[in-house]
């Protein structure tokens, strides 16, 4: 019985010493986040990036070519026998 009484005394002391008792665990109060203004950073100078421009398409100018004279060509007579000078079968 003495152990039961000492258990009750310890339980009562624990309940008195703990402000919330055995009801809930400690939960911190939720606070809204504190607004922090952004840190000012001076602008950093960056040199412009050099990008070569693609070449513009320009057609080459025409090259002058002197007129070409073809050698004369004798047309064979149509529907007739070849001339005597070209006939080698005679």
UniProtKB/Swiss-Prot annotation:
Q: List UniProt keywords, sorted A-Z.
A: Cell wall, Developmental protein, Repeat, Secreted, Signal
Q: Where in the cell is it found?
A: Secreted, Cell wall
Family, according to the entry, reads as follows: Belongs to the plant proline-rich protein superfamily. ENOD12 family.
- Disulfide-bonded cysteines: none
Out of the domains of life, which is the source? Eukaryota
Instruction: Provide GO CC annotations from the record.
Output: extracellular region
PANTHER family listed in its UniProt record: PROLINE-RICH EXTENSIN-LIKE PROTEIN EPR1, REPETITIVE PROLINE-RICH CELL WALL PROTEIN 3
Transmembrane region positions?
A: none
InterPro entries (alphabetical) = Pistil_extensin, Proline-rich_CW_protein
* Species annotation: Glycine max
Q: What is this protein called?
A: Repetitive proline-rich cell wall protein 3
Annotated stretches, region: Disordered:
46-90
Signal sequence range: 1-24
Where is this chain compositionally biased, Pro residues type? 46-65
């Amino acid at each position: 019985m003495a152990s039961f009484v000492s258990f009750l005394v310890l339980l009562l002391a624990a309940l008195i010493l703990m402000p919330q008792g055995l009801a809930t665990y400690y939960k911190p109060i939720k606070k809204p986040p504190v607004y922090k203004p952004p840190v000012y950073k001076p602008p950093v100078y960056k040199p412009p990036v050099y990008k070569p421009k693609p070449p513009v398409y320009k057609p080459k100018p025409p090259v002058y070519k002197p007129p070409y004279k073809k050698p004369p060509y004798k047309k064979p007579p149509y529907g007739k026998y070849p001339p005597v000078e070209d006939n080698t079968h005679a």
